From Swiss-Prot:
Annotated EC: 1.14.99.29
Natural source organism: Eremothecium gossypii (strain ATCC 10895 / CBS 109.51 / FGSC 9923 / NRRL Y-1056)
Positions that bind Fe cation 2: 236-237, 269-270
GO cellular component annotations of the record: cytoplasm; nucleus
Pathway linked to the protein: Protein modification; eIF5A hypusination
One Gene Ontology MF term: deoxyhypusine monooxygenase activity
Annotated protein name in UniProt: Deoxyhypusine hydroxylase
Length: 322
């Protein structure tokens, strides 16, 4: 999800207790809109990440968020895993390991659980991540676990403290840090590394996030060249960063990816969410067409993107969860 999308989802709901937010998230009454369940999830996230200041409430928030892993929605569960990784709260690590190694969970959910463990920097999860990297039947999950292992090792090596990194405009904890500023790459050099199939995946991701932080039209077009990559994981991450950047110049590229019927659902869903985040008028008919998409995660992503577009363009003061 894009940072701007998250900020809207995190707008505080004063009238809801943690228990009420949990009930909306898990759809206790059976009639909660998916968008409102997301809103409840991100409100619980805001509490879960305050584990230093409010440890008991943060623990409850983590437990309530984890209850949603019993849901049937692949989109919701993948967002649950993402949110847990972003909290920095290690209380969720054991549950994330279980979800990652549970092959009954959908691919996108296992992938996001693996990525979340990397975001947490949880060295205690390295063994489980190695197992996932070796044994998971999905290439996307195996690649995610490879990245998570490399990120944890990078963080533990001290490089995180010594490398000169650009101050990010984005609050997300990413699967890899951007390339260090100590080497003065230009955009064509970064594009070459981004698309170098012989380079380690972690380094290619670092090039990706350096291009994201540049954020110019030239950098966006360089990133768009990655949509020809054979890896669904790689392409979905490019769509994600386009949602963060919010540059309308990428709309045609995202539309083209979303229309690819052969493309992996994880890529197409991320393209739909990115289009919703950019929210120019020309994306509306595209998203509406995909409300009837063959892939459930794409249908749900289009619905959420349209709900958020309506909210952005209405006079509503509060995006009510109930």
């Amino acid at each position: 999800m894009s940072t701007e999308f998250e900020k809207k989802m995190e707008e505080h709901i004063d009238s809801c207790s943690l228990e009420q937010l949990r009930d909306i998230l898990v759809n206790k009454n059976g009639d909660a809109k998916l968008t409102n369940r997301f809103r409840a999830l991100f409100n619980l996230k805001c509490v879960a990440e305050e584990f230093a200041q409010r440890p008991e409430e943060a623990q409850r928030a983590v437990e309530y968020i984890c209850e949603a892993f019993a849901d049937s929605s692949e989109l919701l569960k993948h967002e649950v895993a993402y949110v847990l990784g972003q909290t920095g709260n290690l209380a969720c690590a054991a549950t994330l390991r279980e979800v990652m190694l549970d092959h009954a969970q959908q691919c996108m959910v296992r992938h996001e659980a693996s990525e979340a463990l990397g975001a947490l920097g949880d060295a205690a999860s390295l063994g489980a991540l190695e197992r996932s990297r070796r044994e998971d039947p999905s290439e996307e999950v195996r690649q995610t676990s490879e990245l998570a292992i490399e990120r944890i090792r990078w963080q533990a090596s001290g490089a995180a403290a010594t490398e000169q990194l650009q101050q990010s405009l984005y609050s997300s904890v990413d699967p890899a840090p951007p390339l260090s500023l100590e080497k003065d790459y230009d955009v064509p050099q970064l594009q070459a590394l981004l698309n170098d199939q012989r380079a380690p995946l972690f380094e290619r991701y670092r090039a990706m996030f350096r291009l994201r932080d540049i954020g110019s039209d030239e950098a966006c077009y360089a990133l768009a060249s990655g949509f020809d990559d054979p890896s669904a994981l790689f392409k979905h991450e490019i769509a994600y960063v386009f949602g963060q950047i919010g540059n309308p110049c990428v709309v045609p590229h995202l539309q083209e990816v979303l229309k690819r019927e052969h493309e992996a659902p994880m890529v197409r869903h991320e393209a739909a969410e990115a289009l919703g985040s950019i929210a120019t008028d020309d994306v509306l008919p595209v998203l509406k067409r995909h409300l009837q998409d063959k892939d459930e995660v794409v249908r749900e992503s289009a619905a959420i993107a349209l709900d958020m577009y309506d909210y952005e363009n209405s006079n509503e003061l509060e995006y009510a969860p109930a």
